[in-house]
A protein has these predicted regions:
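N-terminal secretory signal peptides that target proteins for export/translocation
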Residues: 1-8
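N-terminal secretory signal peptides
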Residues: 27-89
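Beta-strand-rich cores of mature extracytoplasmic or soluble domains
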Residues: 77-139
Length: 139
């Protein structure tokens, strides 16, 4: 075989192999992160102050469910009755809820909501494990 033909072929094969290794490595990291993320139940203040900006504030801090123009978790939000929801901006506001979900513990982002249920406001109001914090519009 001609040496001029062999060198380019080796270079192409090397590049293809390196790209394949990088792709497999990236997929492995993604699947490990998802596989390690177990379903868990978290209860706290469900805040939706403006369109698509949603988070759950529980005893461990803030869990980002959605950011306008960015991250949005899969799954349905809780349905709140009139006595379970405090309107602060037209129909936007906050309530108390429990969510069965999958989270990314490093970024505090909610990946998926499997199920959710609204709770009476008094449940979160009386829960001493929830930090006393003020909503952005109350500061």
């Amino acid at each position: 075989m001609n040496k001029k033909v062999v060198k380019p072929r080796l270079a192409i094969i090397s590049c293809v192999l390196l790209a394949a290794v990088a792709l497999v490595s990236a997929q492995s990291k993604t699947s490990n992160a998802t596989a390690g993320s177990q379903l868990e139940t978290r209860c706290g203040w469900f805040s939706n102050p403006t369109p698509s900006n949603v988070s759950l504030h529980d005893r461990d801090g803030e869990w980002i469910i959605g950011v306008q123009g960015g991250h949005q978790a899969k799954g349905d939000w809780p349905t709140f009755g009139p006595k379970q929801w405090v309107e602060t901006n037209v129909h936007y506001g906050y309530g108390c809820a429990c969510l069965r979900l999958r989270v990314n513990r490093e970024s505090h982002e909610v990946i998926e909501i499997q199920s959710s249920r609204a709770r009476p406001l008094s449940v979160c109001g009386k829960d001493r494990r929830l930090k006393r914090w003020k909503f952005e519009w109350e500061k």
